[in-house]
Amino acid sequence: MGTLILDSMVNKEAVLREAPPGTILVTVGDVTSERISGFGMTPLLQIIDGKTRRAAHEPAGPPPDVEIIRCENPAGGISPECIETIRRALGSSSPLRLVVSGEEDLLVIPACIYAPDGAVIMYGQPGRGLVAIHVDAGIRYKAKGLLDSVS
């Protein structure tokens, strides 16, 4: 699901083509969240777990206007707690950083379900680049099917 921006092509302009100013943006993954923040962009929701490719990663501190929230999520799964936390976070008007105890990889799925139409979810594809998912009813339907298969 989504559009791949190759690693060699990831820059602020490429990201802005996918998520122009005013777009609700969600980032999933430590490196993706740091890259987007490094371009001077503040996602509505950053989902991180303090790991990159399963190795410990010390995330950069969030900007002062970004509130930290937390949830626990098992590796290879999606916890009801994280689903509810993401649902509530995407109803917020203030930027949030969700720090996951466990693994955040599959949390792109509930982000796609609860983000509004027109939102963009970005996550990293290791060794390939950055994936941008443009949320609409079709993406939401696919994400719900994936959630059912994981649950």
Swiss-Prot record:
<feature type="binding site">
    <location>
        <position position="51"/>
    </location>
    <ligand>
        <name>GTP</name>
    </ligand>
</feature>
<dbReference type="GO" id="GO:0015937">
    <property type="term" value="P:coenzyme A biosynthetic process"/>
</dbReference>
<keyword id="KW-0342">GTP-binding</keyword>
<feature type="binding site">
    <location>
        <position position="104"/>
    </location>
    <ligand>
        <name>GTP</name>
    </ligand>
</feature>
<comment type="function">
    <text>Catalyzes the GTP-dependent phosphorylation of the 3'-hydroxyl group of dephosphocoenzyme A to form coenzyme A (CoA).</text>
</comment>
<keyword id="KW-0547">Nucleotide-binding</keyword>
<keyword id="KW-0808">Transferase</keyword>
<comment type="similarity">
    <text>Belongs to the GTP-dependent DPCK family.</text>
</comment>
<feature type="binding site">
    <location>
        <position position="31"/>
    </location>
    <ligand>
        <name>GTP</name>
    </ligand>
</feature>
<feature type="binding site">
    <location>
        <position position="49"/>
    </location>
    <ligand>
        <name>GTP</name>
    </ligand>
</feature>
<feature type="binding site">
    <location>
        <position position="30"/>
    </location>
    <ligand>
        <name>GTP</name>
    </ligand>
</feature>
<protein>
    <recommendedName>
        <fullName>GTP-dependent dephospho-CoA kinase</fullName>
        <ecNumber>2.7.1.237</ecNumber>
    </recommendedName>
</protein>
<dbReference type="Pfam" id="PF04019">
    <property type="entry name" value="DUF359"/>
</dbReference>
<keyword id="KW-0418">Kinase</keyword>
<dbReference type="GO" id="GO:0016301">
    <property type="term" value="F:kinase activity"/>
</dbReference>
<keyword id="KW-0173">Coenzyme A biosynthesis</keyword>
<comment type="pathway">
    <text>Cofactor biosynthesis; coenzyme A biosynthesis.</text>
</comment>
<dbReference type="InterPro" id="IPR007164">
    <property type="entry name" value="GTP-dep_dephospho-CoA_kin"/>
</dbReference>
<dbReference type="GO" id="GO:0005525">
    <property type="term" value="F:GTP binding"/>
</dbReference>
